[in-house]
Structures are given as structure tokens and as C-alpha cells.
């Protein structure tokens, strides 16, 4: 199974990759926000996000919908009831976060005058860290560097200036100990 993910469904590099995999015999799935897109037409199956029109350059709404859709696919394909239960709790968790907008705004003030920020993750959270780094660059024009938290401890940490914001994305899995070590440093 090959899954192509694109907000517009028109990303040429993703479409060409999906096309090549289909020609090679793979079952293809397109995950897009547009049912009439070239990727949707090409793939054996299409999952339409229905996230609505994406107006922000950073495409945060679509990215969130893509991650949720992929997690739901994994949960269903693997029969992981714990993951399904966790995913069902996501809407309530988001509503709870939205209720903390003042605290979030205060935390964001740390980035107001920061010329740079470091964004760390490990394992499954590394991809999210990379995406958040990109979002900060696109929306705040803050220069960011992204590293695996394990890699960060072996060199890059030496270049970290005092007062530079560091965002660490951690999950409750085998990578948690490494992330705790980074926080301790």
C-alpha cells in the first residue's frame, strides 16, 4: 500500500511518486483536500479530508487533518483500540487547549524577539517537530533549526545560546528517556 499525501492533490513530486508505485503494482491511496485533484483521480482509493479551503500559507488546518486521518488508518488497520480511544479524545483535548489561549499567548511571547529557535523531537515526534519548525519560519519569520533530540545532545547543543527558545516534542514511548535527558541539560 502506498499513500500519497497532498493538501491540494496537485503536488507534482508526490503525484509522480504515487504514479510510479502504482505502475509497479502497489495499491495506491491519495489523501487530499480535493476530490477532483490529479492525485485523487490517479489513486486506486481516495480519502478526502474535507478540511475546507486552506487560506493560511502554513496550512496548519490541513496538516492536522492529514495527521489525524493517517493515525486513524493505522489504528483501524492494526486494530489498536487504545489508539482509537486516544484519537476519539482529540477533539475534546483541542477544545481544552483553545480554552487556554491566554496561557498560550504568554508562552508565544518568548518568540516575539527571538532571532532563532530550536525545535526537537525523536521517533514519531520528529516529523511533527520538523513541521512545527517550518510553520514557525513561514508565519513568524523566525530562523529555526530542527534536530532529533538524541542527535542534539551530540554537538548541536554546544551552539545553543542562552535565552534561545527550545521546543521539545515528546511522546510517551521508548524515546521519552532521551527527551528527559535533553531537558535536564
Model-inferred region functions:
Residues 21-23, 38-41, 109-112, 158-161:
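Solvent-exposed alpha-helices and their adjacent loops that cap or buttress functional pockets
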Residues 1-90, 169-185:
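Glycine-rich phosphate-binding loops that contact phosphosugars or nucleotide phosphates
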Residues 96-103, 144-154, 175:
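A general structural motif
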Amino acid at each position: 500500500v502506498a499513500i500519497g499525501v497532498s493538501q491540494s492533490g496537485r503536488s507534482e513530486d508526490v503525484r509522480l511518486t504515487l504514479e510510479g508505485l502504482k505502475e509497479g503494482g502497489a495499491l495506491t491511496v491519495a489523501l487530499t483536500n480535493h476530490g477532483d485533484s490529479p492525485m485523487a483521480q490517479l489513486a486506486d482509493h481516495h480519502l478526502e479530508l474535507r478540511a475546507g479551503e486552506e487560506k493560511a500559507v502554513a496550512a496548519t488546518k490541513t496538516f492536522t487533518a492529514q495527521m489525524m486521518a493517517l493515525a486513524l488508518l493505522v489504528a483501524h488497520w492494526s486494530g489498536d483500540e487504545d489508539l482509537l480511544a486516544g484519537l476519539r479524545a482529540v477533539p475534546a483535548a483541542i477544545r481544552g487547549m483553545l480554552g487556554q489561549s491566554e496561557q498560550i499567548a504568554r508562552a508565544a511571547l518568548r518568540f516575539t524577539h527571538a532571532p532563532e529557535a530550536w525545535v526537537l523531537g525523536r521517533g514519531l515526534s520528529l516529523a511533527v517537530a520538523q513541521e512545527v519548525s517550518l510553520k514557525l519560519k513561514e508565519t513568524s519569520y523566525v530562523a529555526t533549526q530542527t534536530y532529533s533530540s538524541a542527535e542534539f545532545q551530540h554537538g548541536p547543543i554546544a551552539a545553543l545560546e542562552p535565552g534561545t527558545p527550545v521546543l521539545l516534542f515528546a511522546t510517551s514511548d521508548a524515546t521519552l528517556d532521551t527527551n528527559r535527558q535533553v531537558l535536564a541539560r
